Amino acid sequence: MDLRLHWLARTLADIPEGDAWLGARERAILSRLRFSKRRSDWRLGRWTAKCALLAFRPDDFPAMPALDILAAEDGGPEAYASCGGAVDVSLSISHSHGRGLCAVAPGKCAVGCDLERIERKSLERSISS
């Protein structure tokens, strides 16, 4: 069994036009998001997570529309195959400034990732302190 943590990054420019790659449950969630930035970030997170899952375990997952990335009870992302229920992986999704990051680990475990832009102003303050 693969016990390594995998990660993959994507950008807004990588997301295909339209929503055909989203599952029915995901499209329902997307339709309830009112603000365009929230919709854009949400789509980026789902695209990045699906690409990560398919890149690291391509034989284990269905095509993108049959793979849903939904919020678990604790609010974290969880993968579901539309024909088989929850997928036995752990996910973490982060997005910032038009870039998305997804960490994937096999099985159920605590996994996390965070993507933030380092601002030059912040570095100058840290150095002068």
Task: Give names to the regions the model predicted.
Residues M1-S129:
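Core catalytic alpha/beta fold that binds nucleotide/phospho-ligands
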